[in-house]
Amino acid sequence: MKTALLSVSDKTGIVEFARGLVKADFRIISTGGTKKVLEEAGLSIVSVEAITNFPEMLDGRVKTLHPAIHGGLLARRDLPEHLAALKEHNIDLIDLVCVNLYPFKSTIMQNGVTEAEAIEQIDIGGPSMLRSAAKNFASVLPVVDPKDYQPVLAALAHQTDNVKFRRALALKVFQHTAAYDTLIAQYLGQNGEIFPDELTKTYTKKQVMRYGENSHQKAAFYEDALPVPFSIAQAQQLHGKELSYNNIKDADAALKMSAEFNQPAVVAVKHMNPCGIGLGQNIEEAWDRAYEADSMSIFGGIIVLNRPVDLATAEKMHKLFLEIIIAPSFEKEAFTVLAQKKNLRIMTVDFNQHQDAKELETVSVMGGLLVQEQDAVVETATDFKVVSKRQPTESELKAMVFGQTVVKHVKSNAIVITTDQQTLGIGAGQMNRIGSVEIAVKQAEGSANFKNAVMASDAFFPMEDCVEYAAKHGIKAIVEPGGSIKDQASIDKADELGISLIFSGRRHFRH
């Protein structure tokens, strides 16, 4: 007769699994709550204490940490000296271990949980047994996932529990215990060193996608094991097709932009760049400004609104082809209108939680990972230094603050032309700065509000041509970081052409 050790926090399916093992001629060893559940189901169970000849102690902290357990798990069946050692110490072989771990994650996700309460949910014996079984998978079946109960029983019944099958179970164990330990490290390190010597994070697969950035690329979406409430990963999809890889990247960018604004705001994004951002007294007015900012590029865009969507705004959005609309909520009539388009992805996010979205940014490079803080600085007019003879007006200062807020979300080299309520022109991703200036000006010139526009740059001007081009096309005020060895040339050109030039002192590259 073979032996199975069962000790689970999640009792789902454990009775049926145990019955299947008994049918396969296993005797069952178990602990505490698991033993009680199995016995109440009419199964004959051997207690761990009967195997170890040692009682549970320290409020259950020590149950299975004993040579009688781990010797039976780790002994190699192909080594006579291992089997002789077990016989000498009267230790039985254990052929299957089924363990799932203390619910550490669900504990720390509860409001008001203390660190002491969380620490009590750090499993020690469970991972130890799983790792022992997984190390010796050639002889021991390690089972950590209730989804594997039926496959294991089927493999035992048909004698297909071969090395390949066992190796797959062992892999799942080591992935699971590594993720479990990583989550504990994340929890304990939340207020610790921002860049630890060893960086570990764990993610859970949320979605396997039809394809990645392009149709020939495979892709999946993983969510941080410590959920971020204000995130695309935690957004609730109310309607529409499954999100694509590109949808998720664009929606993430749009959410980050929307979090910048306290007043009603609408952000429209295409290919990770804003194509229109509008502010207003209400969400309909903000939509109108975002749409008017670039009524061509918004087609097929991702829209984020930071206020509930009303019927009037929904009716306007319904006239366009849009990929995604995200908002805190939707009025019933507004949702009914938008849901007429079966493929439109309609989603909600908790905007009250956006201050908690302070994750580090990571970028994968060959052989490593770049990690940095988010560019979360909030600039105001008091941060600006006027370096030109002409002083900006109050409305120009407000517009430049808005422009600085937007430009840090645009791919470098980045130029934005704005009023204090609306983007008018966005030049993104050009290899030379004057190229981005030309694109932004060309786009903005057709706007009725261009006469009130200012220009913002994510980095300094390497020469005076950007100032000259903007001024000759009607821009009266420019904000840029400064810091070029040719700053004076730009200042002189601004004075020559009678416009305001402001240095923010802070660069906002985005690659």
Swiss-Prot record:
<dbReference type="InterPro" id="IPR024051">
    <property type="entry name" value="AICAR_Tfase_dup_dom_sf"/>
</dbReference>
<dbReference type="GO" id="GO:0006189">
    <property type="term" value="P:'de novo' IMP biosynthetic process"/>
</dbReference>
<keyword id="KW-0511">Multifunctional enzyme</keyword>
<keyword id="KW-0808">Transferase</keyword>
<dbReference type="GO" id="GO:0003937">
    <property type="term" value="F:IMP cyclohydrolase activity"/>
</dbReference>
<protein>
    <recommendedName>
        <fullName>Bifunctional purine biosynthesis protein PurH</fullName>
        <ecNumber>2.1.2.3</ecNumber>
        <ecNumber>3.5.4.10</ecNumber>
    </recommendedName>
</protein>
<dbReference type="InterPro" id="IPR016193">
    <property type="entry name" value="Cytidine_deaminase-like"/>
</dbReference>
<dbReference type="Pfam" id="PF02142">
    <property type="entry name" value="MGS"/>
</dbReference>
<comment type="pathway">
    <text>Purine metabolism; IMP biosynthesis via de novo pathway; 5-formamido-1-(5-phospho-D-ribosyl)imidazole-4-carboxamide from 5-amino-1-(5-phospho-D-ribosyl)imidazole-4-carboxamide (10-formyl THF route): step 1/1.</text>
</comment>
<dbReference type="GO" id="GO:0004643">
    <property type="term" value="F:phosphoribosylaminoimidazolecarboxamide formyltransferase activity"/>
</dbReference>
<dbReference type="InterPro" id="IPR011607">
    <property type="entry name" value="MGS-like_dom"/>
</dbReference>
<dbReference type="Pfam" id="PF01808">
    <property type="entry name" value="AICARFT_IMPCHas"/>
</dbReference>
<feature type="domain" description="MGS-like">
    <location>
        <begin position="1"/>
        <end position="144"/>
    </location>
</feature>
<comment type="similarity">
    <text>Belongs to the PurH family.</text>
</comment>
<keyword id="KW-0658">Purine biosynthesis</keyword>
<keyword id="KW-0378">Hydrolase</keyword>
<dbReference type="GO" id="GO:0005829">
    <property type="term" value="C:cytosol"/>
</dbReference>
<dbReference type="InterPro" id="IPR002695">
    <property type="entry name" value="PurH-like"/>
</dbReference>
<dbReference type="InterPro" id="IPR036914">
    <property type="entry name" value="MGS-like_dom_sf"/>
</dbReference>
<comment type="pathway">
    <text>Purine metabolism; IMP biosynthesis via de novo pathway; IMP from 5-formamido-1-(5-phospho-D-ribosyl)imidazole-4-carboxamide: step 1/1.</text>
</comment>
